[in-house]
Every structure is written in C-alpha cells, then in structure tokens.
C-alpha cells in the first residue's frame, strides 16, 4: 500500500488505490509512468527469459555492443575514467555502476466519454551506485543504505560529451555522499553492540553480459485508441449510480542499460501496454465503493476485444449498484473461502514480504521466518516458488517477469517453500546468514537501492478439489463448526503488511466483493465494508484445501526499494478460520445534484425526463 513509511509498511498497490479526483488521477497516471527498471514487464521480442541469460566473463564486456549505442558507450567510457581516477583517492570505491533507464511512453486518459489526458514523453534517468570500504563493511551498511546511490536526469539526445558530463557530475555527488557515510558506519559499529548477523554488506557475483535487442514496436493507431478510450469511458454514463469513472491506456517502450566496474554490461529492452477501467459510487452511509478491471499485454493488439471490454463495464456497473444496496459486514471469525485472485494477494502480503532476504538481516524487522529454515511453515500440501523467468500462465501475461534484476544478476526460480517446509529466501546482493549469494531478486525503482523483492510468486498444491466444489466444502466447514454462515471473498483490490518488530506483526487485505454463504441454504448475500486481518503464523496454518485451477493477480508492490511490478498466482483456498473487521470509511453525503443527462437530473422548460436506462443483469 502507498505509504510514506515504506520501511514499516509494505504492500501491493494498484490503480484502484489512486486519487479520486480527475485532476489528481491524471497526475497520478503521468507520475506512474516515470519509474521503471530492468525488472519491467517484457513483451514478445524483448529481452529473453533467463534460461539463456547470456555469457559471463571476468573482464569488462560489451565493448563491441557499445559501438552503435551512444548511451552505452558514454556509460562505459565514463565508468572506466571514473574508476581509474577514483582508485587514486584515499577512500577508493571497490564497486561502481551506472544504470540508465530510457523510457518512451504514451498515455490516454478518458472520463465521462471525453479525453482527460493525451500525452507522450521520453524520459532518461541515471543511477550511479557506489560502495566504499570493502564488501564486509561499506557505506551502505544498516541505516546508511541510501548513501549507495545518487540519481538524476540524463540528456535525452545522443551527445556523448553531454551524457558523460552528466554521469561525471552524478558520480562526484555520489562519492561525496558515500565517503562520509562510511565514516558514520564505522563510528556507529564501534559503539553499538555486536550484530547477530555478521554477513558482509555485498556479495561477490560473476560479471554478466547480455545485450538485448528491441524489436520494432507494433504499429499503434493513436486515433483509433483515442476514440476507443472516449467510447469506453462514455459507457459508464449509462449507469447513474456510477458517479466517477476513469479509463486509461499506457503504452511503454523501455530500455535499461547497466554497466559496472566488475565487468557487467546488461541491456534489456521491454514493451508493455496497460489498460485500466475504474468505476466508483457511494453508499447512503458515505462509504466509497469501487470496481477496477486491469489488462496488460506486450502491445495494444493483445488487449481484450471491444465486446469483452463492454461486458466488463456492464458487470462493473451491476456490481457497484449491488454494493450500494448491500449491508455492511460485521466483525467475523470463522470459515472463509478465498478465490484464486484473493488467495494470491493474501500470500503476497502475508508470506511473500516476510521471505525477502534483507528482512532476515535487519534487526528492526520482525524476522518472522528468519530461523525457520528446514521447519514446516505451511500445510504439507502447499509449496511456494518465486519465478520471474516465466512470462505468462494460462495465457495471462505476468507483470513480475524479468530477465535480469536491477543488479545485473540473471533472474532465477527460487523454491522458497517445498511441501510446507521453508527452504530459502529471495536474495539480492545483500548476503544474510547461510545465504551468501544473490538469486536474482534484487529489485528497485530508479533512484533507490535494490533489495530482495518478489517477482512472480506462485503457490501450488497437492490437496486439490474441483473448483466448483469449493463452495460446498465451505458450507461443510461452516456446519462442522456450528456457524450460521461463512464468507466467500470473490475479488480483491490489494493490501498491506507490517513487518517491523516495533509494530504488530499483522496484515490487512482489502476485498471488494464479499458474500455471506449461509449454512441453511439461504441465497448468498453480498456485503461490503470488510477487511481481512490477522497475523501470519496463525493465518497460514488454517488452510484446509485448495481448488484445482491457478489464478493470477497482477499489481504494483511498494516497499523500501520503491514500486515494482509483481504477480501472484494461487488456487482458491478454504480456511478453517479467518478474521475480518469493519473497514474505515468516509461519511460524505451523496451528490446533491444528479449527474447531467440522467433520469433524475433537472429538465428545463418542463420537458419529459429521458427514459431510465436498463442495466443488464
């Protein structure tokens, strides 16, 4: 969840949690196009999977590739010059890297049947990462970690001298940050108690070269898509209950280049297209209610058809009308069934963040699983892996795919839990006790230091029942416990988790569509205003069985190293016990006036009101 204290609160965010005014929403779309990384979702023809990650070398590589790439040539030339000159200083860096993020993007935003935003831009940003001291103890240790990178805008053209001068200036700034930070680290280490985890600050990895070549992007029909965005947003006008709507299309072509003093040279092109449709309404008690549908593909050609999108909007409007009339849920503790998407978000928040490597070393963290390697942490029928090398599952593109992480390490599948037993963590180049190497999960948004992060978190099960039988299994569990009803969580918008030991080790998952499923055979009842809450160690042991189909949740996850695209994949899951609480909500009244053009709006000169549009059920 978006939070200023990202070191304390970690979570998934999506467009569904963005600002609720047109101007703020449009600005959020524009700002969201800025960050991207080596880990950005790749489309067909972009950087290949890590199965063929490229060659390795013990000396500088990629010189030939730089001949026709002015930016890469400028990076390598300035890196060599800076490395040679800084070696002569009293505090010579032992590691230096440049990463340049190049991004061309186009954004269309529509609302109420008209375009709100239509813009394109080219952005280029450079990160200069530097480490002084030695791998055992350097300037990035502990709370001084931000001193390891300085970021700034880079000239957009191919003027090599201008590019090198900017890199030179950023390198100078970074060196002047890193040296005092190292002094502070050494002083602090001398007066503080000995740390429990004495692992080095930086791992030694084999230098890698991978020079990906971007395919020509598919032709994009700007006029046709402008018209389509207006048409789609105009569809919401058929529904008076929907008082806010946004439809946005973001098309991005990106190129990330990374070179290091160790000899790595990694260039990864990527392409992605993302369509987001959102509708919002408000219940009589002031609770804001929303429905969001998100689609992504390598290009606009891979998005759903016009007919499919119209059907989604109709379903969103029907859901919103039903939510307005639904009762508010009461606090509850009992059997619950999570759809596959809901279970995917649940695992991302409750488990995934606690398996990120740096959290096992940081003494401010709760370290829920740090000393549980080799122990059972889930039911034996469940296994969990994180595999950023996979581009899609069941025909659905995965947002968490990447070929190389932000430290230039090839992405890898990591089996973190096998048959319920904890086996590993998601590692960047920050070693922890018993895990000395990266496994390709060092990720960050530009301007921030990488940490171990999730990519494609995948939950598999050997205790499966057909998905159409899961509801009956829920009813059986409700009857077994003597409860009047259980809860079914059909759709979800995101969540967040608390991981620092100064805070409760708790999580909160934010459902959108929730039903009461009665044991006595009454029809399911839609409810609203409910959040899933709990603590990880208790919640994860209460999974009874799972469905037999995998479901995908694509989103954007925010943590210390910024916002990165992620996917979570899981089957539907039955829990013997799940706790929910009432959701805090606003108490603003309904709009005083009806929207113009709706059946209840004022009509001048005594004209008849237009017929009320029908909602397809």
Q: Each predicted region: which residue ranges?
A:
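Active-site bordering "gate/hinge" segments
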Residues: 38-404, 409-412, 418-421, 434, ...
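Hydrophobic alpha-helical bundle architecture
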Residues: 400, 460-538, 554-561, 565
């Amino acid at each position: 969840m978006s939070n200023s204290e990202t070191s304390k609160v970690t979570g998934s965010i999506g467009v569904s949690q963005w600002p609720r005014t047109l101007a703020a929403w449009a600005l959020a779309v524009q700002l969201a196009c800025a960050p991207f990384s080596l880990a950005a979702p790749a489309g067909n023809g972009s950087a290949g999977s890590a199965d063929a990650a490229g060659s390795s070398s013990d000396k500088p590589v990629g010189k030939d590739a730089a001949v026709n790439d002015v930016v890469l040539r400028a990076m390598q030339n300035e890196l060599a010059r800076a490395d040679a000159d800084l070696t002569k200083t009293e505090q010579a860096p032992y590691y230096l890297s440049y990463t340049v993020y190049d991004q061309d993007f186009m954004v269309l935003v529509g609302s109420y049947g008209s375009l709100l935003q239509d813009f394109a831009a080219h952005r280029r940003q450079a990160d200069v990462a530097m480490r002084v001291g030695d791998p055992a103890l350097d300037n990035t240790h502990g709370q001084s970690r931000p001193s390891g990178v300085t970021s700034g805008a880079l000239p957009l053209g191919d003027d090599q001298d201008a590019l090198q001068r900017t890199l030179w200036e950023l390198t100078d700034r970074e060196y002047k940050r890193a040296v005092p930070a190292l002094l502070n680290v050494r002083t602090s280490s001398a007066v503080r108690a000995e740390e429990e985890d004495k692992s080095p600050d930086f791992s030694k990895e084999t230098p890698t070269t991978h020079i990906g070549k971007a395919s020509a992007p598919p032709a994009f029909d700007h006029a046709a898509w402008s018209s389509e965005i207006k048409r789609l947003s105009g569809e919401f006008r058929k529904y008076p209950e929907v008082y806010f709507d946004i439809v946005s299309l973001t098309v991005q072509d990106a190129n990330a280049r990374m070179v290091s003093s160790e000899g790595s040279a990694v260039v990864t092109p990527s392409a992605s297209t993302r369509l987001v449709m959102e509708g919002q309404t408000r219940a009589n008690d002031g609770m804001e209610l929303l429905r969001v549908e998100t689609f992504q593909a390598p290009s606009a050609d891979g998005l759903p058809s016009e007919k499919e999108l119209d059907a989604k909007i109709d379903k969103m409007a029907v859901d919103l009308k039903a939510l307005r009339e639904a009762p508010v849920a009461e606090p509850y503790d009992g059997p619950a069934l999570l759809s596959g998407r809901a279970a995917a978000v649940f695992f991302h928040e409750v488990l995934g963040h606690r398996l990120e490597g740096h959290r096992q070393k940081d003494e401010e963290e709760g370290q829920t699983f740090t000393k549980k390697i080799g122990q059972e942490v889930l039911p034996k029928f469940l296994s969990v892996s994180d595999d950023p090398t996979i581009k899609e599952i069941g025909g659905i593109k995965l947002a968490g795919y990447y070929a190389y992480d932000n430290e230039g390490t090839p992405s890898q599948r990591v089996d973190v839990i096998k048959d319920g037993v904890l086996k590993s963590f998601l590692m960047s180049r920050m070693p922890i006790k018993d895990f000395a190497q990266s496994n390709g999960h060092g990720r960050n948004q530009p301007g921030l230091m990488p940490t171990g992060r999730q990519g494609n978190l995948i939950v598999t099960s050997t205790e499966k029942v057909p998905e159409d039988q899961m509801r009956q299994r829920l009813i059986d569990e409700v009857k077994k416990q003597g409860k009047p009803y259980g809860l079914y969580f059909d759709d979800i918008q995101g969540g967040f988790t608390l991981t620092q030991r100064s805070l409760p080790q708790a999580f909160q998952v934010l459902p959108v569509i929730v039903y009461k499923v009665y044991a006595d055979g009454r029809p399911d009842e839609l409810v609203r205003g409910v959040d899933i809450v709990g603590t990880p160690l208790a919640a994860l042991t209460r999974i009874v069985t799972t469905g037999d189909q995998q479901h995908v949740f694509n989103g954007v996850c925010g943590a210390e190293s910024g916002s990165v695209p992620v996917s979570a994949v899981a089957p539907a899951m039955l829990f013997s016990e799940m706790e929910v609480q009432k959701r805090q909500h606003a108490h603003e009244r309904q709009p005083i006036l009806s929207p113009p053009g709706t059946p209840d709006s004022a009509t001048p000169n005594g004209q008849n009101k237009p017929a009320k549009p029908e909602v397809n059920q």
